Amino acid sequence: MRIVGLTGGIASGKSTVSNLFKASGIPVVDADVVARDVLKKGSGGWKRVVAAFGEEILLPSGEVDRPKLGQIVFSSDSKRQLLNKLMAPYISSGIFWEILKQWASGAKVIVVDIPLLFEVKMDKWTKPIVVVWVSQETQLKRLMERDGLSEEDARNRVMAQMPLDSKRSKADVVIDNNGSLDDLHQQFEKVLIEIRRPLTWIEFWRSRQGAFSVLGSVILGLSVCKQLKIGS
């Protein structure tokens, strides 16, 4: 199975690319969706986060007020690192199970959409790595327009993440999203061809079909050995 790593930065257009993969019929494991699930009221992640940040981050329903929590962690490096440390084990296990589900369903190619792909060292498990890149100027402009943030707040959120230039240097494939939506679509079509190329032997053996092939070969080999033993 080919596990494609997709990452970018806030307001880079990564979610748009993720949706394009979905529309093309390629399964996507979304770390943000997993993160929302592990923060649901009463979950292990919810308990640890509430214990660390207090009940003031909760809505009247008891669910985490995500915008409020975001304001807290984006204004403090130490609090952001604490949140990442608390959530990492739950998110990693959640992503693993989602990948396992796709493997069990017979998927040959999947995309793992992880904003912190390099930061949490998940890049070692994905190939190729696709980075959606924009200039910092474009990133700030889009973030302010999208979320109605001041330049200072937008800059704090951008600076809280690994620089996109650093991510670009580690990528196998770079999608430059500084242009129009049409430009993005044209680049995506080229990426799609790369993603859908035939599996390597290693990728094939990691797939469900490859595992069944190995199992079938073992069973056949044992059967032949048994017949030879009986005939001797």
UniProtKB/Swiss-Prot annotation:
Pathway: Cofactor biosynthesis; coenzyme A biosynthesis; CoA from (R)-pantothenate: step 5/5
Domain DPCK residues, every copy: 3-206
Pfam families in UniProt: CoaE
Keywords noted in UniProt: ATP-binding, Coenzyme A biosynthesis, Kinase, Nucleotide-binding, Peroxisome, Transferase
Record localization: Peroxisome
Lineage: Eukaryota, Viridiplantae, Streptophyta, Embryophyta, Tracheophyta
Catalytic activity: 3'-dephospho-CoA + ATP = ADP + CoA + H(+)
Gene Ontology MF terms in the entry: ATP binding; dephospho-CoA kinase activity
Protein name: Dephospho-CoA kinase
Organism: Arabidopsis thaliana (Mouse-ear cress)
EC number, as in UniProt: 2.7.1.24
InterPro entries, sorted: Depp_CoAkinase (IPR001977), P-loop_NTPase (IPR027417)
PANTHER family (UniProt xref): BIFUNCTIONAL COENZYME A SYNTHASE-RELATED, DEPHOSPHO-COA KINASE-RELATED
Function: Catalyzes the phosphorylation of the 3'-hydroxyl group of dephosphocoenzyme A to form coenzyme A.
Entry's Gene Ontology cellular component terms: chloroplast; peroxisome; vacuole
Major localization class: other
Similarity comment: Belongs to the CoaE family.
Gene3D superfamilies: P-loop containing nucleotide triphosphate hydrolases (3.40.50.300)
NCBIfam families (UniProt xref): dephospho-CoA kinase
Residues engaged in binding ATP: 8-15
Enzyme class name: transferase
GO biological process: coenzyme A biosynthetic process
